[in-house]
A protein has these predicted regions:
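Bacterial N-terminal signal peptides
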Residues: 7-17
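Sec/Tat signal peptide C-region and signal peptidase I cleavage site
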Residues: 18-22
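Cell-envelope and extracellular/periplasmic
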Residues: 23-283
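Positively charged n-region of N-terminal signal peptides that target proteins for export
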Residues: 1-5
């Protein structure tokens, strides 16, 4: 009987939102995540994926009555970590990697906005409309779900999150649709600068982590773009490129479950290094 009560109490944690505090909690670390299809989903979940430390949270991007989610509130980050999502993505294992190493009093929260197939231009604050007007109808429908403006959707969610905690970093996975675009680093810098300004952040305190596309060692269809991505830190000083070498794929374009788990861990390890933790260092 006691075991059943404990199980019910734990289940309640998954269904009900985490209460926001009156003032932002400096030990609640928030990460903004955006991009295209690999940021959306990386493959099927297994039972182990559903075991998540209660200190890892996700802000509901949409209302999801079937999950008990209300947009703009925090929930235990059991995948899929998007109301309309499926499977897991790199963000799942990014968060898990952080909470496994950070002190017990630190929580990690993520906000995720992803539009499969989009160019980085979709997140350009002043010119996104021109871009989306020329895109395919299915993508326009996804964008409509974000109020017609995914960038502003991310900013609005982030402002809500800032009432609860502190934004510590930005995660990006995008580039397949910009393959060959040598201006991509400059475009990413523009999006980053706008986020920093619109959220009143300090650029030297908020790094951007950008992950490579499926690597050449996996015969990635867009692997050549990684040479362009490698230039990003020269354009955006507080940015870091995460290697995708060895991260597996089933179609040479999207990371599969195993690849997404490994890739997310690498994002997490890099962020821990930025926060001052050495590889293998315990809490």
């Amino acid at each position: 009987m006691k075991t059943n009560l404990i199980s019910l109490a734990f289940a309640a944690l998954l269904l009900f939102p985490i209460n926001a505090s009156a003032d932002p909690d400096p030990n609640f670390h928030i990460y903004l995540c955006f991009g295209q299809s690999n940021m959306e989903s990386g493959g099927r979940m297994n039972e182990a994926d559903r075991t998540v430390d209660k200190r890892f949270l996700v802000m509901a991007d949409f209302d999801a009555p079937n999950r008990g989610w209300e947009k703009g509130k925090w929930y235990h980050a059991v995948p899929p970590i998007a109301a309309k999502g499926r499977g897991i993505c790199m963000v799942d294992y990014f968060g898990r990697t952080l909470v496994a190493k950070l002190p017990e009093n630190v929580r990690v929260g993520v906000i995720k906005v992803s539009v499969p197939g989009c160019k980085i231009e979709l997140f350009e604050k002043d010119s996104f409309q021109t871009y989306i007007d020329g895109e395919r109808d299915w993508m326009k429908n996804i964008v409509k779900g974000y109020g017609g403006n995914p960038y502003q959707f991310l900013v609005d969610m982030a402002k809500v999150a800032q009432k609860d905690g502190v934004i510590k970093g930005i995660l990006l996975h995008q580039g397949e649709s910009n393959a060959g675009d040598k201006e991509w680093p400059n475009k990413v810098k523009g999006v980053y600068d706008n986020l920093i300004n619109d959220l009143n952040l300090k650029p030297d305190e908020v790094p951007l982590l950008a992950g490579e596309l499926v690597h050449a060692d996996q015969q990635g269809r867009c692997a050549g773009f990684n040479t362009i991505m490698a230039e990003l830190p020269k354009t955006l000083p507080n940015s870091h490129v995460i290697s995708s070498a060895g991260c597996t794929t089933n179609d040479r374009l999207h990371f599969n479950s195993e690849g997404s788990r490994e890739f997310g861990k690498r994002y997490g390890v890099k962020m821990l290094e930025i926060l001052g933790f050495k590889p293998g260092e315990s809490k």
